[in-house]
């Protein structure tokens, strides 16, 4: 049986090297023949030990982000410049790449991504899941109404952590260029960077994926509203937010599966120091969060967190 290649793209700085290793190790472990993957890693200045560690796990093709690209992004302490790298995929990927699967580093893959890769885009520029925390463009922390005039009230809002992208459609329709222009216009007000920009400028050019391909890691906790159907067979779990399982002990059903994969890769990369802040966030997540979540959500929706 001839192998078939899945093009995977990721973007990190050194701080996210370890979770990227976990995500790629879990992805490779779940991938079934005839699929194989080639990983395009967008970065600014990753250290050689980090690149070597990742390359020991997968077929790695590093791509350096140029100053020309990064110069179009706002300097924001909340995000590393690499966070918006998906917007540069149409100009940085090899010309023969027609489809690419972009994955955030803070994920755990639990099922074969072959069916995800084969998803029918139905003529749209990309596929993604509806963001469970921001289900509509008009939801709190979605696209501000003053900016998103013309977007229907019921337009869904996508999470950019998993995106199956038609690269040629992005080029021809100027998807990334429009998003970059949006970021440039409202640099001091943009909230979720490229995710907000894509939802604001191309809200009608993406198609939804099954939620199981980008499930919040809080599935099963008393405050989580994820549907039972989506939670029954998770394909990819997303550790979005401040609770990062490579830095701290966390609560929830995916803490142990993550720890098992982490143990397989941790020695391949430079060690990361844990801080007192990590310890306090861990304590909050494991002991207090189930009871304090309504307040957390209240603060988050008002962009105070």
Spans of model-derived segments:
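Conserved catalytic core of nucleotide-sugar-dependent glycosyltransferases
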Residues: 118-181
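Short internal beta-strands
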Residues: 37-45, 128-130
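Short, acidic, metal-binding catalytic loop of nucleotide-sugar glycosyltransferases
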Residues: 26-35
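A glycosyltransferase accessory/donor-loop signature
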Residues: 1-12, 22, 160, 165-305
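Short, charged/polar "capping" segments at the starts of alpha-helices
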Residues: 45-52, 136
